[in-house]
Structures are given as structure tokens and as C-alpha cells.
Amino acid sequence: MVVAPYLAVAIGGSLGAMSRYLVTIMAQNAWGIKFPYGTLLVNTLGSFLAGFFLIVLVGRFSAEESFRLFLFTGFLGAFTTFSSFAAESLFMFEQGYWFKLMTNILVNNVGSLSMVFIGTLVAKYVLLGHQGSN
């Protein structure tokens, strides 16, 4: 059994989970707990990073498989959280917080999809430079 891929995922996952916890705590301290801003922030930021690094590391530099496992499966997999989003949405549904529920669902989904796209655009801009602006 090859240990390197499992170790890459484990280390990335540990760092991603700790980062998610820190970002969530910072978001709660900044904006309070009336809305799951921490979950929204990690999901949208993680989506941006996934799009960015998909272009930079996979498309441009052909990163090693163990590094891709570390970053995408490990770090970003643990940093972003669909399960917290689902649980928080269920809580809002059960409490009858309809506006918060719909906002949470819409902003997490549209925001995350938009951010992965924006991440790819930013990566392409960074890699290609601003050639057209001369």
C-alpha cells in the first residue's frame, strides 16, 4: 500500500479543518451568529481557491498527484463544508426562518459557483498577464 496519497489527504484535511474553524470564528466575531456567515465565507472562498488552483496547478504547472490530493481533496475538501450548510439550512427551515433559509441556499450555491468561475478567470489573468492593456 502506498502511504503518500493518504498522508497528503490527511495533512491537507487537518490544515483545511483548522483553517475552516479559524475563519468561522473570525466571521462570527465580526458579524455575529444570526446568519451562518462563517460557512458562507469558507464555501465561497474555497470555491474561488479551487477555481484558481485548478487553472494554475493542474492546467498550467501539472502539479504532482500527491499535491493535488493534498490541496483539493484534503485542504479544500475540509475547508469547505456542504454538511454544515445543509444542517444550518435545516435548522432555519425547522425554525421557520424562511428569508434566511432562502438567502442561505441561494447565496451559498450561486456564490460558490460564481466564485469558482471567478477564480478561474483570475488565474488566467495572472498567468497570461494583462497583455491587452499595453
Curated annotation (Swiss-Prot):
Keywords: Cell inner membrane, Cell membrane, Ion channel, Ion transport, Membrane, Metal-binding, Sodium, Transmembrane, Transmembrane helix, Transport
Regulation: Na(+) is not transported, but it plays an essential structural role and its presence is essential for fluoride channel function.
Example GO molecular function: fluoride channel activity
Magnesium listed as a keyword: no
Origin superkingdom: Bacteria
Reaction(s) catalysed by this chain's protein: fluoride(in) = fluoride(out)
Protein localization: Cell inner membrane
InterPro entries given in the database record: FluC
UniProt similarity note: Belongs to the fluoride channel Fluc/FEX (TC 1.A.43) family.
NCBIfam families in the record: crcB (TIGR00494)
Reported function: Fluoride-specific ion channel. Important for reducing fluoride concentration in the cell, thus reducing its toxicity.
Protein name per Swiss-Prot or TrEMBL: Fluoride-specific ion channel FluC
Gene that this polypeptide is encoded by: fluC
